[in-house]
């Protein structure tokens, strides 16, 4: 069986919650059929990404990650996870979509195709078109782009012009499963509300959940122990992840 690959990218400050989430990703890599975690950093990027442009180092980390994710999934296939993903269980079912179909995407707020978590076979028409358009735009702009220019905006435009590229992809309505809280409500729903609020977030199918940068940033003043021993809605999901090992 071909090795199942999960790709991540991180540079800069190591936030405490990010460290916890990454440990969970690695721990679950031995669950089910297993997968290989490939954490790409500024130290090893040349091993995985070809033809890195001269302006890459001047791009903000979020845009660097956008560039990396398209390249590695197009070239190698696998699953891309943003580093603020909380893996709750085996990812076998997501890899099954890559093996039985072309892959999967998630709609943020059930409306916007999103690039934070997705999976694909290598070199599909969609991935090759996305990569081509991304490189063209970056070269024109010398890497100086808007927040979602090469992410959700680009894959949304491809959907409108070449919707057939998505025919063999599973598209999740995120609010119903993997992205149950829209980004602007994440701190309120996962951190601020009482612990029992987790009951409004759990879904029938939920091998992972999307968190956002506001969540790991607001917890940074706590120690890892304080985060793990907290009584916030997010603790239900962290504890469930450990239980599902």
Predicted regions and their residues:
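Small-residue hinge/turn detector
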Residues: 67-78
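Glycosyltransferase-associated regions of secretory-pathway enzymes
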Residues: 1-66, 83-245
């Amino acid at each position: 069986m071909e090795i199942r690959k999960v790709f991540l990218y991180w540079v800069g400050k190591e936030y405490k919650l990010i460290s916890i989430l990454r440990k969970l990703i690695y721990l679950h890599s031995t669950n089910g059929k297993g997968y290989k975690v490939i954490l790409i950093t500024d130290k090893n990027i040349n091993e995985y990404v070809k033809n890195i442009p001269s302006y890459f180092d001047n791009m903000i980390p979020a845009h660097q990650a956008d560039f990396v994710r398209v390249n590695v999934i197009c070239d190698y296939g696998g699953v891309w996870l943003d580093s603020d993903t909380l893996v709750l269980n085996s990812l076998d079912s997501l890899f099954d979509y890559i093996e039985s179909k072309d892959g999967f995407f998630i709609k943020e707020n059930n409306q916007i195709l999103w690039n934070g978590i997705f999976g694909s076979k290598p070199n599909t028409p969609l991935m090759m078109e996305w990569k081509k358009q991304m490189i063209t735009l970056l070269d024109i702009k010398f890497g100086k782009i808007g927040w979602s220019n090469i992410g959700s905006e680009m894959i949304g435009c491809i959907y409108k012009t070449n919707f057939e590229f998505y025919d063999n992809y599973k598209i999740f309505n995120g609010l119903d499963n993997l992205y149950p809280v829209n980004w602007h409500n994440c701190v309120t729903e996962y951190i601020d509300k009482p612990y029992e609020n987790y009951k409004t977030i759990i879904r029938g199918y939920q091998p992972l959940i999307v968190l956002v940068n506001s969540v790991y940033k607001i917890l940074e003043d706590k120690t890892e122990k304080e985060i793990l021993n907290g009584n916030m809605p997010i603790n239900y999901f962290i504890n469930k992840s450990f239980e599902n090992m």
